[in-house]
Amino acid sequence: MSEKKGVKDAYSIKTPEDSINLYRSWASTYDSDFAKQNDYRSPIEIGKYFDKYSNHKDTPILDVGAGTGLVGECLNESSREIDAIDISPEMLNIARLKNCYSKIIEADLTKRLLINDNHYGAIVSAGTFTHGHVGPDVLDELLRVTKSGALFVLTIHYQLYKKAGFDKKILGIEKSITKPNFHEVSVYGNNPDKDHGSD
């Protein structure tokens, strides 16, 4: 019987191969063992702020690091075209069953994506720009695949915003984007993982 996976395992990831291996074994229980048990709220917050800032031009939408489709579920009522992209085929198989997405894309976000320039009207992402997962350089590729004026609604782990260079990256691309709005949100609700309740 395998040990239950958790936030500590996710934060220990070092390479894309680590991600593939972790989520291969975690996919079938991710929603119950992690999201439900920890009252994982980031996808809900993404949905809330997407509704706040979006307009009819923000389509199609790309859910970056979509995993099992938790963000897609929060956007599903928007009736807009949403595609999911993730490195884990097993996680994407769970997302596919939720019928939230028009297209499922298996890809490594640290490499050039097989997506045309200026295709998407919005990017959403929860829990991807965090320890061991995806760093700030991925923003360049996401800018390539989005239209001018595209809406980005992302969570970035607060401990990494400066440490991993997200602040410098955003400063470096500021001529290509509108002034960002920052909101501090709770990642977890009332029952978080005991080691990461303050994330």
Predicted regions and their residues:
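N-terminal, positively charged/glycine-rich alpha-helical extensions of SAM-dependent methyltransferases
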Residues: 1-29
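Conserved alpha-helix/loop element of class I SAM-dependent methyltransferases that forms part
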Residues: 39-57
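A short acidic, Gly/Pro-enriched loop at the edge of an enzyme's catalytic core
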Residues: 113-123
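A short SAM/SAH-binding and catalytic strip from SAM-dependent methyltransferases
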Residues: 121-135
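A short glycine-rich, Lys/Arg-flanked "PGG" loop and its adjoining helix->strand segment in the class I
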Residues: 137-148
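Conserved beta-strand signature within the Rossmann-like core of class I S-adenosyl-L-methionine
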Residues: 149-157
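Class I S-adenosyl-L-methionine
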Residues: 178-199
